């Protein structure tokens, strides 16, 4: 059964709108990762955004619980049901139906669609929710309904806000496998397994803790797909289900170990963590020293340590990650698109950690011998493992788990604090915590005049070094920040890079402006000093000519978003952007790849608006008025009460503080150069306009001219087709008579290399020519060696022969007893492969 599709279809038939899984990185500063199905509906539940036109929703949401408040990382591999990454099936009501329908829908799906027996189902409810008890009694005897307290059956989003009692459906997995003292309904054992949680959001909790009834109660439910899959397959552990089978097979092949061996927990850790690594990398999270990137790093390193336990001393996880990408490619197409990138990044991170893993393990094992009687691991050693060998603290604790020990946290924290004191503050720290308070007290916000002009006289209010310490004089070859009394330089923002240019003093260039940024409301420009400048100097500030090219790309970005919404639908919204002088990059919400027809329509629409020579129009107005006029706003962005609105007549209207062209005709032309996936539900378009558009057209024209010359045909398509036909015919050429043929004990032996032609067809021709044959033909193509072999009335199997030879080439072979093929990337081993092929054949013939 396709549980995901069954669930979504069931609720769609009940009038629910189906929502795609939102990215694992939410647009919510309070969350590290998307950890529940309700996250994408949080603003609806809290009233920040109005209820949708269809007040019922359903989704299958990818969730991540590693790091932050919800962290299952340390339990993964040691329990039957914990995962870092999992799918949560859910249905939601926004002030529409409530308890009765939610319970009815859940019971129907669980008993009819999933086929669970009613006699095996148990229900928990909040101790004060008599209404839910009465509703459940229609389906379940009262002795299988248990009342529980706030700890188990009351849900709230935070200390204040929407909240309410919840009801959970449990299934009895049978006493046959569970005989522990806690294996009773309501106990801590695994016999009674929770499969579905129904949250009845009917209250609002005030800041002082008082509960008030909501005028329109809502429903939020969640059910783990992995858990249901295991139950349907009568498995007592999620990792034993068919969802994880391809991963277990790959790990078994890599380790030459059986999944049912003593290393079963390590199998499970690697399988789980490979899924998390694959999805996080594919959705744009990268290995880092902090935040989400560090959580990703911790997950990978924990997996590598478990691989190490199973004897894997080289990079391996990237191969398991590749299997994940293939396994989920039908439901999450971006995994297939990004598979190569994901595997490469995973491999490189593995290589980095493996450089220190062996040494770190030696230190760890040595330190184990000196554990005190309380089994407390030295905090200083744990810190050294962290600081020198890259062992995250939870990895060290995980290694200590099997020894019944734990880290001396006080000692570890003390070492960490000492390092922080020694360390020089990072740029981010300087920016966030530096003497900006002193700067803000000393200087009022400088005046930005860049909308009206690209050049103006200005007074240098102050110069600052890289630590933002004020300096009196800036000398040649220094890089310093300057604060001008008024400035034409636009500060980086809204996706557009900061202005560059120059400062002139006494008609001479005194400094090159490398960049412009806004810190706490002040526009600073980064300078490379050419001629000494000091506080109070009068200068001429001049923006570089690239400003116009940036403006062209910025205006083109607005036209692009408008075109995307027209072609793809109003669901398109900006998810990120970059505007430079030579290109633009625009990320937007859309669930699938754009086809050629859609891309052509978008490009044509943008160019149509350019050719209309539409004037830009800038207005300042209250935020509500701007939204009423249909101005597009960036989701999640905080706006002031009064906003700047940029429009190009009917073509585009957006809230924007950036620099734009006065007329779309100045953009010149627009070309999409690339469309790709960024993460789940987010696509990216890269494009050029203005001078970059002309340069691209010029280069393409030159390439076309060269192609015509090489093909000796002014019709390039016809020339290419003719060339393809020629290549095809050459590949069909008969086997070269130059291939060496030896006759040994009545069997014709052919082992050789060809430069062109279809080697499989060559084998067929050889088999038709000779009554008894052993043949293996090699060919180098696309930085690989491919081989084909045929056996006819000879004492060896083709598939065995091919596979043995392929291993020298770093590959694998497959086929039948009479025919097989293989390939590998180790081109330098070709001669060794030839020798092995011949020696293996001779041995078989002599045997």
From Swiss-Prot:
It is an enzyme of class 6 (ligase). It is found in: Cytoplasm. The gene is alaS. Its EC number is 6.1.1.7. Binds 1 zinc ion per subunit. The lineage of its organism: Bacteria, Pseudomonadati, Campylobacterota, Epsilonproteobacteria, Campylobacterales. HAMAP family: Ala_tRNA_synth_B (MF_00036_B). This is Alanine--tRNA ligase. Catalyzes the attachment of alanine to tRNA(Ala) in a two-step reaction: alanine is first activated by ATP to form Ala-AMP and then transferred to the acceptor end of tRNA(Ala). Also edits incorrectly charged Ser-tRNA(Ala) and Gly-tRNA(Ala) via its editing domain. Belongs to the class-II aminoacyl-tRNA synthetase family. InterPro entries: aa-tRNA-synth_II/BPL/LPL, Ala-tRNA-lgiase_IIc, Ala-tRNA-ligase_IIc_anticod-bd, Ala-tRNA-synth_IIc_core, Ala-tRNA-synth_IIc_N, Ala-tRNA_ligase, Ala_tRNA_ligase_euk/bac, DHHA1_dom. It comes from the Bacteria. It catalyses: tRNA(Ala) + L-alanine + ATP = L-alanyl-tRNA(Ala) + AMP + diphosphate. Consists of three domains; the N-terminal catalytic domain, the editing domain and the C-terminal C-Ala domain. The editing domain removes incorrectly charged amino acids, while the C-Ala domain, along with tRNA(Ala), serves as a bridge to cooperatively bring together the editing and aminoacylation centers thus stimulating deacylation of misacylated tRNAs. GO terms for cellular component: cytosol. GO terms for molecular function: alanine-tRNA ligase activity; aminoacyl-tRNA deacylase activity; ATP binding; tRNA binding; zinc ion binding. The keyword Nucleotide-binding applies. It comes from Helicobacter pylori (strain HPAG1). It holds the Pfam family tRNA_SAD. Its main location: cytoplasm. SUPFAM superfamilies: Class II aaRS and biotin synthetases, Putative anticodon-binding domain of alanyl-tRNA synthetase (AlaRS), ThrRS/AlaRS common domain, Translation proteins.
């Amino acid at each position: 059964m396709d549980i995901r599709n069954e669930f979504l279809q069931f609720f769609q038939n009940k009038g629910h709108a189906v929502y795609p899984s939102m990215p694992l990185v939410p647009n919510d500063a309070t969350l590290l990762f998307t950890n529940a199905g309700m996250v994408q509906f949080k603003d609806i539940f809290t009233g920040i955004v109005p209820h949708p036109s269809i007040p019922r929703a359903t989704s299958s949401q990818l969730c991540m619980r590693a790091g932050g408040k919800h962290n299952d990382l340390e339990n993964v591999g040691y329990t039957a049901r914990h995962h870092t990454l999992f799918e949560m099936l859910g249905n939601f009501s926004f002030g529409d139906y409530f308890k009765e329908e939610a319970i009815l829908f859940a019971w129907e799906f669980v008993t009819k669609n999933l086929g669970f027996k009613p006699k095996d189902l148990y229900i928990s409810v909040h101790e004060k929710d008599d209404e839910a008890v009465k509703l459940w009694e229609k389906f379940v005897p009262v002795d299988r309904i248990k009342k529980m307290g706030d700890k188990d059956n009351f849900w709230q989003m935070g200390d204040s806000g929407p909240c309410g009692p919840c009801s959970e459906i449990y299934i009895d997995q049978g006493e046959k496998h569970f005989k522990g003292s806690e294996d009773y309904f309501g106990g801590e054992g695994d016999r009674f397994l929770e499969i579905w949680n129904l949250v009845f959001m009917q209250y609002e909790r005030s800041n002082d803790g008082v509960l008030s009834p909501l005028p329109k109660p809502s429903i939020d439910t969640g059910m783990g797909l992995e858990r249901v899959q295991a139950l349907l397959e009568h498995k007592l552990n999620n990792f034993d289900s068919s969802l994880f089978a391809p991963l277990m097979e790959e790990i078994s092949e890599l380790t030459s170990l059986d999944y049912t061996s003593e290393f079963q927990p390590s199998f499970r850790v690697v399988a789980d963590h490979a899924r998390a690594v694959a999805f996080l990398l594919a959705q744009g999270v990268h290995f880092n020293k902090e935040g989400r990137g560090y959580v990703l790093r911790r997950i990978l390193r924990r997996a590598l340590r478990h691989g190490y336990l199973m004897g894997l001393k080289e990079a391996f996880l990237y191969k398991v990650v590749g299997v994940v990408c293939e396994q989920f490619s039908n439901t999450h197409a971006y995994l297939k698109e990004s598979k190569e990138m994901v595997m490469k990044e995973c491999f490189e991170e593995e290589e980095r950690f493996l450089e220190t893993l062996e040494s770190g393990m030696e230190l760890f094992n040595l330190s184990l011998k000196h554990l005190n009687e309380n089994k407390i691991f030295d905090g200083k050693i744990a810190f050294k493992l962290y600081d020198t060998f890259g062992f995250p603290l939870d990895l060290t604790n995980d290694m200590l788990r099997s020894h019944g020990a734990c880290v001396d946290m006080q000692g570890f924290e003390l070492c960490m604090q000492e390092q922080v004191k020694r360390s020089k503050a990072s740029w981010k720290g300087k920016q966030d915590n530096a003497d900006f308070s002193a700067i803000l007290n000393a200087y009022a916000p400088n005046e930005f005049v860049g909308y009206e002009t690209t050049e103006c006289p200005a007074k240098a209010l102050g110069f600052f070094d890289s630590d933002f310490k004020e300096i009196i004089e800036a000398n040649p070859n220094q890089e310093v920040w300057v604060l001008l009394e008024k400035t034409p330089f636009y500060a980086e923002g809204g996706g557009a890079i900061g202005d560059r240019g120059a400062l002139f003093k006494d008609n001479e260039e005194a400094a090159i402006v490398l960049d412009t940024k806004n810190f706490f409301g002040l526009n600073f420009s980064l300078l490379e000093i050419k001629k000494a400048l000091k506080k109070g100097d009068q200068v001429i500030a001049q923006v570089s000519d690239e400003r116009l090219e940036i403006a062209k790309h910025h205006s083109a970005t607005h036209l692009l978003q408008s075109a995307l919404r027209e072609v793809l639908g109003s669901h398109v919204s900006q998810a990120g952007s970059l505007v430079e002088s030579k290109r633009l990059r625009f990320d937007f919400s859309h669930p699938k790849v754009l086809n050629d027809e859609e891309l052509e329509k978008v490009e044509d629409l943008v160019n149509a608006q350019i050719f209309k020579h539409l004037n830009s129009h800038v207005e300042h107005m209250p935020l509500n008025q701007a939204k009423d006029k249909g101005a597009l706003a960036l989701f999640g962005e905080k706006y002031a009460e009064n906003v700047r609105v940029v429009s190009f007549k009917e073509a585009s209207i957006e809230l924007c503080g950036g620099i734009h062209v006065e007329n779309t005709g100045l953009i010149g032309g627009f070309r999409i150069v690339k469309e790709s996936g960024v993460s789940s539900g987010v696509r990216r378009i890269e494009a050029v306009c203005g001078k970059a558009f002309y340069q691209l057209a010029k280069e393409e024209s030159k390439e076309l001219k060269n192609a015509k010359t090489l093909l000796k045909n002014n019709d390039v398509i016809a020339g290419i087709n003719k060339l393809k036909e020629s290549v095809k015919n050459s590949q069909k050429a008969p086997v070269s008579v130059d291939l060496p043929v030896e006759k040994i004990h009545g069997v014709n032996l052919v082992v050789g290399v060809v430069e062109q032609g279809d080697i499989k067809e060559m084998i067929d021709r050889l088999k038709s020519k000779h009554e008894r044959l052993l043949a293996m033909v090699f060919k180098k193509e696309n930085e690989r060696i491919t081989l084909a072999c045929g056996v006819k009335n000879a004492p060896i199997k083709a598939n065995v022969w091919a596979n043995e030879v392929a291993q020298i080439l770093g590959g694998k072979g497959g086929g039948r007893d009479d025919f097989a093929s293989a390939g590998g990337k180790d081109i330098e081993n070709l001669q060794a492969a030839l020798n092995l092929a011949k020696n293996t054949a001779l041995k078989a013939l002599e045997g």
